Amino acid sequence: KSEGDYKPVLQALADMGYTFVEAASYKDGLLYGTPPQQFRRDVEATGMKVLSTHCTLNLSDKQLATGDFTEALKWWDECIAAHKAAGVEYIVVPSMRRIETLDGLATYCRYFNEVGARCKAAGIKFGYHNHSREFEKVEDRVMLDYMLENTDPDKVFFQMDVYWTVMGQASPVDYFTKYPGRFTMLHIKDHREIG
């Protein structure tokens, strides 16, 4: 979208009574094509606040194979600075590339721990949002369980999408019980509405 297209949507959300928004369009230092400080002002002009955002940078084949994600962390440093300027409290990774091995998943857990440490240093919380495929197995381990057990709770939280958890044949309540305190945020949607 071009700069400013989101303003009527923001006003409509505020008119419905929403007080926070979660953005999902970070690219090249901009949110919805707008400098982060301006996006923050536009949101706050409606009486709302930018609480969180979805953004990610997947690891390349080389980074995944070598475990060296130094270049990716440079991108994250810029991303974190932009989100701090936008007043964001939570940065959430909405998905990751398909992983076929536990070694690859372990690399992603180390990557997320490092990004989480950088977010924490900036006063931002860092998390991961599931879909149904995180309930698939990689080498006989459920991906989400492995991620929960191999990320640092002090650096990485999880934003459970309840719909996708159920679609993955799992119970949200079972996960809340098994991993207390790991699910800081939820996404709730109605299956009847989205099919």
At which residue positions do the language-model features occur?
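Active-site acidic/histidine proton-transfer and metal-coordination neighborhood
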Residues: 20, 61-158
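Hydrophobic faces of well-ordered beta-strands that scaffold small-molecule active sites
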Residues: 1, 21-23, 50-55, 91-93, ...
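N-terminal pre-domain/capping segments
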Residues: 1-89, 120
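Active-site-proximal loop/turn and secondary-structure-junction residues that shape catalytic pockets
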Residues: 25-27, 56-59, 95-99, 130-134, ...
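A short acidic, helix-capping loop that chelates divalent metal ions and anchors anionic groups
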Residues: 1, 58-66, 99-102, 168, ...
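Mature catalytic domains of secreted/periplasmic carbohydrate-active enzymes
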Residues: 21-22, 33, 40-42, 47-48, ...
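Histidine-acidic metal/acid-base catalytic patches
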Residues: 1-17, 87, 141-160, 164-195
